[in-house]
């Protein structure tokens, strides 16, 4: 496929305007190819991913998490990012990151996780919360709310999530709320900022990863169940 057409196809699925200003979704490395014959898709670029891409003569790696996130002041092969960048350029491998663009996409990570859980009446928060003043609209928390097919206890919901996301039994941390669970809020990755929105929406459970102490304490005080299924656990899907 033509390189230009491939980029256009990716951005039709995960438009760049869905990313906040601080995110670094998009082209990260372009090595001059006009044609891309083989693509490798990954969650993170690691030593193992690069080795596989080299062995399979991959023209592009499409990664969820950006290889280059902050601005680069120098490329130093004594550092992981610099070493990876040099190695990829030397191998002629392009890199594209679909990070929050894919999280917020119509059928991206949040949507797919909701479908795995069998949720109905889905509502995307990103579309419901316009920017205020000069604030970038995409800076606002993104995620999704919806309903389970039936009422569940917190324990039943936890078991359902473990099975649906195919994560280990000890792969979650949980704050048990006061009520049975029907309405859920979720945000893949590190989505603690979405907790307030799920509380306002009347959710009985919030699912995300990388939950901080004060977020867990807030959930307990509000009586909402909270499940930390891990950053990887909510995105390896």
Tell where the protein language model's regions lie, with residue ranges:
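Active-site catalytic microenvironments in core metabolic enzymes, especially phosphate/sugar-handling
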Residues: 1-237
